[in-house]
Design a protein with these regions (language model features):
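Helix-loop-helix junctions and helix-breaking kinks within/between transmembrane helices
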Residues: 15-27, 67-70, 74, 92-95, ...
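Long extracytoplasmic/lumenal interhelical loops at the membrane interface
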Residues: 168, 290-306, 310, 314, ...
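N-terminal hydrophobic segments of proteins, predominantly signal-anchor/transmembrane helices
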Residues: 2-17, 32-102, 410
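Juxtamembrane membrane-water interface segments that cap and precede transmembrane helices
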Residues: 12-20, 80-83, 160-177, 303, ...
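Membrane-interface helix-loop-helix junctions at transmembrane boundaries of multi-pass membrane enzymes
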Residues: 1, 40-58, 197-208, 244-250, ...
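A membrane-periplasm/extracellular boundary helix in multi-pass inner-membrane enzymes
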Residues: 142-146, 240-291, 310-313
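Loop-to-helix entry and N-terminal half of a specific, functionally important transmembrane alpha helix
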Residues: 2-6, 205-213, 351-359, 366, ...
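Alpha-helical transmembrane segments of multi-pass inner-membrane proteins
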Residues: 101-106, 121-158, 166-170, 175-242, ...
Length: 447
């Protein structure tokens, strides 16, 4: 069941049960429901002792409850917008958060007697298995991306059966089994971390795999994916260096190979000037870009961030309540943001698309206030510091390597959260589950 949960991470934008709301298109949700059922069953039968870190994790959730009470009168009187009222948005978004908290709790309960190393091996195997399936699909999608249409019937066949929206990426960007190209790129960042972890044992075999991942990311044309991969690769090398392992020099050589592959690929994909290409990509996220292709998206993304921060500043203690930011965003968008058709659609009550916030941090600030954001960040920082302590102080070499992996996944998750405004980022919840379990194992050994 855990294998399936991780295996289905890249399967997004799929046909699903309407009752699941925004989660219906995420295939991992369905094995996750079974996992929650098992967690409840284990709780009834065995009454397990709660993990201390999980109890700490419930403190930010308490702020959600306080925010509901603090804003309840505004929530119930919220006029209908885009066919939703305050209570329906409160229920749907609270359900998403509670669901992933229950998934994390269930993982802790169901796998209480299993070692972190065993669980990690299952997760890594699932990541590579789904990646191989994804790669097979991408082989048929790449001809379309580079301008050929002879594989379109096969792509359409898959879309007609599985995808919620039957269309091909009209900009000819690789999206694989995901809803859109950025989602694919985010998943491939996870595969990069798994690849580096496995490369400790058989590095040569994984150089080609890393190259293939880099090719797929370049064909997704994601503006942040290549930069994310470079950052997370360097972060992994930094964390690995903290282990003071005798193999550190060899591993740094391997990291150098990985980065060299990334830079060469970047250079080739940009006509021979990778540095200039990377700088242009960084500049392309600005609202002052001359790139019309990116401008509408940038105005929408930065406009929503600006509006979310403004909402948070006006409601800085508890925010406006979970799920409520969309009602306020149209009044807070800056004038320059309306240059984007996306913002105009988000502000139109007749358009069904709910106004998004493209970062969990600004969303938490607007909906849960400064207290909610501070507690969320504190929880993550505490876990990160405890993992760092394992890396530098544990006498168990394998625990050090596991801590490096989990610390890298947590950092990656927090980077992805900077451009993802929903709590349904499964890799984050799996990372903190494994981190809490490893910390608990270390505590038990030291007692």
């Amino acid at each position: 069941l855990l294998f399936l949960l991780v295996f289905f991470i890249p399967f997004t934008g799929m046909k699903g049960l309407p009752a699941m709301g925004e989660m219906k298109g995420e295939f991992h949700v369905y094995p996750a429901i079974l996992m929650v059922f098992l967690g409840v069953l284990y709780t009834i039968l065995k009454l397990p002792k709660l993990n201390r870190s999980f109890l700490l994790m419930l403190i930010p959730f308490a702020v959600v409850v306080l925010g509901i009470f603090a804003n309840y009168s505004n929530i119930i009187s919220q006029p209908e917008f885009k066919y939703s009222d305050g209570l329906s948005r409160l229920f749907s978004q609270s359900t998403v958060l509670v669901f992933y908290l229950l998934v994390t709790y269930s993982l802790l309960v169901v796998f209480k007697k299993d070692s972190v190393e065993t669980i990690v091996n299952v997760c890594i195997s699932a990541i590579f298995s789904s990646f191989y399936v994804l790669s097979a699909y991408c082989i048929f999608e790449i001809p379309y991306v580079i301008g050929f249409d002879f594989t379109n019937p096969l792509l359409d066949m898959y879309s007609n059966v599985f995808r919620a929206e039957e269309y091909r990426e009209y900009l000819r960007r690789l999206r694989g089994l995901s809803f859109e190209a950025p989602s694919l790129a985010n998943y491939l960042s996870i595969v990069v971390v798994a690849t580096i972890y496995r490369a400790r044992h058989s590095g040569k075999k994984y150089w080609l795999l890393y190259l293939w991942i880099a090719v797929l990311i370049s064909l997704s044309y994601s503006r942040t994916a290549i930069l994310t991969i470079i950052i997370i690769t360097l972060a992994y090398a930094l964390f690995y260096g903290l282990t003071k392992s005798i193999k550190t020099r060899a591993f740094y050589f391997l990291i150098s190979i990985f980065l060299f592959i990334s830079i060469v690929l970047l250079d080739l994909s940009s006509g021979g000037n990778g540095t200039e290409y990377l700088i242009s990509k960084i500049k392309s996220i600005s609202i002052d870009t001359t790139d019309d292709y990116h401008l509408a998206s940038n105005l929408g993304r930065w406009g929503s961030q600006y509006a979310a921060v403004a909402i948070g500043l006006d409601n800085w203690i508890f925010g406006v309540g979970i799920g409520q930011s969309g009602f306020y965003l149209p009044s807070y968008y800056p004038d320059w943001a309306f240059g984007s058709f996306q913002v105009r659609n988000w502000s139109n009550s007749l358009d069904p698309l709910w106004p998004p916030i493209f970062s969990i941090y600004t969303r938490i600030f607007s909906e849960l206030g400064s207290i909610g954001l501070a507690l969320f960040m504190t929880f993550n920082v505490v876990l990160i510091l405890k993992l760092k302590s394992i890396i530098t102080q544990s006498k168990n070499v394998q625990d050090k390597y596991l801590a490096v992996l989990l610390l890298s996944l947590m950092v990656l998750s927090l980077i992805l959260f900077a451009q993802f405004g929903s709590f349904r980022l499964l890799i984050y919840w799996i990372s903190i589950f494994l981190a809490m379990k490893l910390i608990s194992e270390q505590r038990m050994r030291n007692e």
